[in-house]
Amino acid sequence: MEICNQVSQFSQLPDTAVALGLFDGVHRGHQAVIRAAANCAPELMPAVFTFRFDTREVVTKKQFGQLLRPELKAAKLEEYGIRFMLEPPFSTIMKMEPESFIQGILFNFMHAKAVFCGEDFRFGKNAAGNTELLKRACEKNGVQFHIVQPVLDDGVPVSSTRIRAALREGDIALANRLLGSPYMTCGTVVHGRHMGHELGFPTINQLFSPEDLIPRFGVYATIVEIDG
């Protein structure tokens, strides 16, 4: 999968089917949008437009905790069939007018011929752009537009907010169910006090990024991959 972090005036991309969203965690709801774009049409290249950072983190200066490292997010998108990802820093597009986003990024740069998003997708300056505006622009330019309905779990839409709440409460089973796969993170192994080794239970100490969301303090069964 090709990854691009900035928008230029010209693009060599073929016609694309674009999935729009932050895709924080690539949970089951996100997967529905991504698969819809990936399975749209063989003549259209499956692509994703996303942001490099969590929108709320940039706007409010609060740390919500990312559900998936950027490299893991990219790997998951590729796993679901995405061949191109545009992922600029949110700060570079947050003041863009909705119409400029549609024309400049979706149509001119990404060559979108089909667009997919969730029903609550917002974009542009002050989040002024919505699905109705996007639908009208797509219809005017002969571009397919599809709103993918939410995926429900116990009658409630799957969301990154629910997953964060589950992790903070230590409910890994719920978080995994909403994600559609085991929660994962990665960190650098660092030396500790070697107490586990002395007790006969060697452990691995990891240094996590301050951006990561770490589950509630406790003991968890995990599968660990080292140097992989």
Question: Language-model segments: what does each one mean?
Answer:
Residues 91, 99-103, 107-228:
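Active-site cores that bind ATP or allylic diphosphates and position pyrophosphate for catalysis
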Residues 77-78:
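ATP-dependent adenylation/nucleotidyltransferase module used to activate substrates
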Residues 1-9, 86:
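Short acidic-hydrophobic, aromatic-tinged amphipathic segments that line or gate anion-handling sites
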Residues 56, 95, 125:
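Glycine/Thr-rich phosphate-binding loops of Rossmann-like dinucleotide-binding domains
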Residues 64-73, 94-102:
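Glycine-rich, highly charged phosphate/nucleotide-binding loops
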Residues 9-69:
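N-terminal catalytic cores of NTP/NDP-binding nucleotidyl/phosphoryl-transfer enzymes
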